[in-house]
């Protein structure tokens, strides 16, 4: 009995999830500012740096979650769910940073409508991820569990929208772009942006699993 009392219990996992999700939303907003003001080199650099800052701050939280997971005996949800969720969330910011860096590395000259649409859908997915994560501490309450599932379904729909935009963008790119180098640049960026919404869907699926097992 005394041994059980001495073991670390629960931990502040939900608080750390919320902090990380806040950086996801922050990074997504910075990314939108980046593509909206891409023509201005100073603003482009500023907003790219903001994406990088959000990614580094989130990395520290991911490390703290994994550290806490190793020292906590009793966790609020399954240990594998905690590990899978924080790493999937971290992947979202990694992809946001990858996309912003690729634009600079490939010397993309301007943003087209397809990039703007894919960026917008990715950012909306990130915002919904933040909301879904914020509901986790109270998913034992039926109304909160229902709201979490609904939010995850919204993420799924946004990801489907991103898939459609991606297919249309790729079709147009291969029909209309004659410069092979430009085609390769844009294809890479389209794929990176669509991967963000894919990873948000992965997070949504993990959250749905947590809700179904714990509500």
Q: Where on the chain are the PLM-derived regions?
A:
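Cytosolic, long alpha-helical scaffolding segments
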Residues: 1-215
